Curated annotation (Swiss-Prot):
Pfam families: ATP-synt_ab, ATP-synt_ab_N, ATP-synt_VA_C. GO terms for biological process: proton motive force-driven plasma membrane ATP synthesis. It comes from the Archaea. This is A-type ATP synthase subunit B. It is found in: Cell membrane. Its main location: membrane.
Length: 464
């Protein structure tokens, strides 16, 4: 768009429908372009081009279309897509979903302005994630190990404590044995005012805000802002990682609210719906978020992602978790049954998986016994869960001594390993030592997945 076209002010609004306005007679307008809107009262609002064809543009107004009309509303296309002013001064600050300060502090003095859609990352320039990130949560560090540059979602359900878990990960996550800087970028989308207050108070109470950047989009904020929030958060993360050399963990909650905003906007544009009314391009859209995690050759920083989503009706085959699973590198599944037992965090380790766990465990990263001892307790827990179904039919008295040991192991595993305090920050050594204590329930001859050398080195019965 030329400088002359940037200064053109259009008064040719032909229709207003919900958050959308249609402008006719336009020239040189591009998809995603930012729009300056002047209301009849003189108030300034901002919008974004959702569709541009020939001489017609469809614009979504961030602040809504209340008080706009077709005769007195003025439109000016600014000639560029949404950009974010970034700076290291953003650390320790809380912003709304559009990147404006929420904490009463001053506006950020930008060191750079970056397109929030990011830049295409050449696959050849990517490096494989291989460094352990400690979250202090046994069911993640032990059985579903997170590595720097990975993207692993948490699949939750309505009413489950994923917000507690998100806040705990945000304040406890760290890179072990390293002087490298670590930061958390937290993006909340479509949350209630109560949830917003919880997150803000939690970050301030624990001091986690010092090394964090927080973006909060509320449920009653515009849907288009919900689409921008994760992109703004990821742009901040990429700046801190690739320009400032920091290791950044991005936590995004709730991706389901993000997808609902996609569906709302698609319906307003009269698009042909896909599965369950979601737009057919939802897979591609989610990929533009998740694929911004990783490590880049020649850059010391990394971007690691933990997106959190609530599965409607606890349905893991729902389009949102289904498509997310195709793009990401595993999943951490929260269990309603464990939550009913009062176990926190209610992580079900059996369907959970970290596809890159093998890259971040072992001697020099966690501990030499990590993969073997976790494999052993995982197999024992799976057998114990299977025996619970058998007990429901034949009764516990019908079980052999061996079966009773595995049944006990499953119970102790949930109470000692899975369950931990909301402020309990376990080191990986503490996590693995708990596993060895649990394995004392079984006779040593049952520990077939662990070498004799490791048994002699770590088994409590062999320690002096």
């Amino acid at each position: 768009m030329s400088s002359l076209e940037k200064n053109i002010e259009y008064t040719s609004v032909s229709s207003i429908a919900g958050p959308l306005i249609v402008v006719e007679g336009i020239k040189g307008v591009a998809y995603g372009e930012i729009v300056s809107i002047t209301c009849p009262s003189g108030e300034k609002r901002t919008g974004q081009v959702l569709e541009a064809r020939e001489d017609v543009a469809v614009v979504q107004v961030f602040e809504g279309t209340t008080a706009l009309n077709t005769s007195e509303t003025k439109i000016r296309f600014v000639g560029e897509t949404a950009k974010l002013g970034v700076s290291t001064d953003m650390l320790g600050r809380i912003f709304n979903g559009a990147g404006k300060p929420l904490d009463g502090g001053p506006d950020i003095i930008a060191e750079d302005k970056i397109d929030i859609n990011g830049y295409p990352l050449n696959p050849v320039s990517r490096q494989s994630p291989n460094d352990f990130v400690q979250t202090g949560i046994s069911t993640i560090d032990g059985t579903n190990t997170l590595v720097r540059g990975q993207k692993i979602p948490i699949f939750s359900g309505s009413g489950l404590p994923h917000n507690l878990l998100a806040a705990q990960i945000a304040r406890q996550a760290k890179v072990r044995g390293s002087d490298e800087q670590f930061a958390v970028v937290f993006a909340a989308m479509g949350i209630t005012a109560e949830e917003s207050n919880y997150f803000m108070n939690e970050f301030k109470r624990t001091g986690a805000l010092e090394n964090a950047v927080v973006f909060i989009n509320l449920a009653d904020d515009p849907a288009i802002e919900r689409i921008l929030t994760p992109r703004i958060a990821l742009t901040t993360a990429e700046y801190l990682a690739y320009e400032k050399g920091m290791h950044v963990l991005v936590i995004m909650t709730d991706i389901t609210n993000y997808c609902e905003a996609l569906r709302e906007i698609a319906a307003a544009r009269n698009e042909v719906p896909g599965r369950r009314g979601y737009p057919g391009y939802m897979y591609t859209d989610l990929a533009t978020l998740y694929e911004r995690a990783g490590r880049v050759k020649g850059k010391s920083g990394t971007v690691t992602q933990i997106p959190i989503l609530t599965m409607p009706h606890d349905d893991i085959t729902h389009p949102i978790p289904d498509l997310t699973g195709y793009i990401t590198e595993g999943q951490i599944v929260l269990s309603r049954e464990l939550n009913r037992k009062g176990i926190y965090p209610p992580v079900d380790v059996l369907p959970s998986l970290s596809r890159l766990a093998g890259n971040g465990v072992g001697e020099g990263k966690t501990r030499d016994d990590h993969s073997k001892v976790i494999s052993q307790v995982y197999a024992g827990y799976a057998e114990g869960i299977g025996l619970r179904d058998l007990v429901a039919v034949v009764g516990e008295e019908s079980l052999s001594e061996r079966d009773r040991a595995y049944l006990k192991l499953a119970d102790v595993f949930e109470k000692k390993f899975v369950q931990q305090g909301k402020d309990e920050d376990r080191s990986i050594e503490e996590t693995l030592d708990i596993v060895w204590d649990i394995l004392t329930i079984l006779p040593e001859e049952e520990l077939k997945r662990v070498s004799e050398d490791l048994i002699k080195k770590y088994h409590p019965n062999h320690k002096k």
